[in-house]
Swiss-Prot record:
Summary of the function given for this chain in its UniProt record: Component of LSm protein complexes, which are involved in RNA processing and may function in a chaperone-like manner. Component of the cytoplasmic LSM1-LSM7 complex which is involved in mRNA degradation by activating the decapping step. The LSM1-LSM7 complex loads onto the 3'-end of single stranded RNA. Component of the nuclear LSM2-LSM8 complex, which is involved in spliceosome assembly. The LSM2-LSM8 complex plays a role in the biogenesis of the spliceosomal U4/U6-U5 tri-snRNP complex by accelerating prp24-mediated annealing of U4/U6 di-snRNA.
Superkingdom in the source lineage: Eukaryota
Subunit structure: Component of the heptameric LSM1-LSM7 complex that forms a seven-membered ring structure with a donut shape. The LSm subunits are arranged in the order lsm1, lsm2, lsm3, lsm6, lsm5, lsm7 and lsm4. Component of the heptameric LSM2-LSM8 complex that forms a seven-membered ring structure with a donut shape. The LSm subunits are arranged in the order lsm8, lsm2, lsm3, lsm6, lsm5, lsm7 and lsm4.
GO molecular-function term, one example from the UniProt record: U2 snRNA binding
Gene: lsm5
Keywords associated with the record: mRNA processing, mRNA splicing, Nucleus, Ribonucleoprotein, RNA-binding, rRNA processing, Spliceosome, tRNA processing
Primary residence: nucleus
Protein's name according to its UniProt entry: LSM complex subunit lsm5
Species in which this protein is naturally found: Schizosaccharomyces pombe (strain 972 / ATCC 24843)
Ranges where the Sm domain occurs: 6-79
Length: 80
């Protein structure tokens, strides 16, 4: 039998790991996943924010991202 994993279970397995978040806007975030809630609002630490239009990056120690604005979550962090 194949094993089924639910989306929130997969995100839960990523806590403490690097995560790359692509937003619906022109922003991307890469950091370590600290936690999340049922609405997939997430808390990241050691965050790098990327503006895909201007190419500008910013560093943040911690950040809360609204799950409603997310397009994609990619475990493993942003590729270099």
């Amino acid at each position: 039998m194949s094993m089924t994993i639910l989306p929130l279970e997969l995100i839960d397995k990523c806590i403490g790991s690097n995560l790359w978040v692509i937003m619906k806007s022109e922003r991307e975030f890469a950091g370590t996943l600290v936690g999340f809630d049922d609405y997939v609002n997430i808390v990241l630490k050691d965050v790098t924010e990327y503006d895909t239009v201007t190419g500008v990056t910013e560093k943040h120690s911690e950040m809360l991202l609204n799950g409603n604005g997310m397009c994609m979550l990619i475990p493993g962090g942003k590729p270099e």
